[in-house]
């Protein structure tokens, strides 16, 4: 039992590294774009004031910011592809479609209940507990939502991708299409449930961080202790 748990954790840790592998390069390119558009640096280097250079820097910065801002999507597809034992590309594709369903289910639920926050002119959705992912406003679960859906997709896909049904609709709801059908239903339920489950979790996290910040040296000790505890 212990060996199985250890092996599962090792697989999970390796799968988590798959999306992170590219973030170092993305971070460097993002920094390069920021430098090319830096007002302070352009005063010392007149070349950076040239229109094409500034345009290239702005494109580079905006494009890489889009990658960094959508880590949940990367974790969802990356984990599904890494953990699936067969036809990994199919698992990644199903994970991406499931993530769209998850986001939209949350958006529709919030809209129907009148809970959809209105973005502020200055701060946007900051502090509202909601965010916009791929143009869809929903509950802000951060990367947790993507990680959870990626794990579920890999598990469901491995157990359903070979399922064959008989009858008229057997050809439609068999194999990978049955995996997608199962994940579509599960993603919709998760998107709906997140609207009710996640806000209390957000409040608990905010209260915990506020307590640590207000506790002075004790809070610093607890933060450092927990951080070191998580280092493998």
What spans do the regions from the language model cover?
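Residue-level signature of transmembrane alpha-helical entry/exit and packing/kink sites
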Residues: 142, 146, 179-183, 220
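Membrane-interface loop-to-helix entry segments
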Residues: 171-178, 182-185
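Acidic, low-complexity cytosolic linker/stalk segments
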Residues: 1-4
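Generic detector of multi-pass transmembrane helix bundles and their immediately adjacent loops
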Residues: 148-151, 177-178, 192-195, 232
């Amino acid at each position: 039992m212990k060996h199985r748990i250890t092996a599962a954790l090792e697989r999970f840790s390796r799968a988590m590294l798959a999306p992170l592998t590219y973030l170092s390069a993305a971070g460097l390119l993002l920094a390069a774009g920021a430098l090319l558009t830096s007002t302070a640096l352009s005063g010392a280097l007149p070349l950076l004031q040239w229109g094409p250079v500034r345009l290239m820097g702005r494109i580079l910065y905006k494009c890489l910011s889009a990658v960094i801002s959508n880590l949940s999507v990367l974790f969802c597809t990356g984990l599904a592809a890494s953990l699936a034992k067969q036809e990994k590309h199919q698992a990644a594709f199903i994970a991406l479609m499931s993530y769209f369903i998850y986001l939209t289910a949350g958006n529709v639920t919030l809209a129907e209940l009148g809970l959809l926050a209105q973005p502020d002119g200055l701060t946007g959705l900051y502090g509202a507990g909601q965010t916009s992912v791929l143009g869809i406003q929903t509950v802000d679960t951060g990367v947790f939502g993507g990680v959870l859906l990626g794990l579920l997709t890999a598990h469901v896909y491995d157990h359903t991708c070979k399922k064959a049904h008989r009858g008229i609709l057997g050809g439609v709801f068999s194999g990978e299409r049955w995996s997608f059908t199962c994940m579509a239903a599960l993603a919709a339920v998760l998107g709906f449930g997140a609207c009710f489950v996640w806000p209390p979790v957000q409040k608990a996290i905010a209260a915990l961080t506020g307590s640590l910040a207000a506790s002075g040296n004790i809070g610093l000790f607890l933060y450092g202790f927990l951080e070191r505890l998580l280092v493998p």
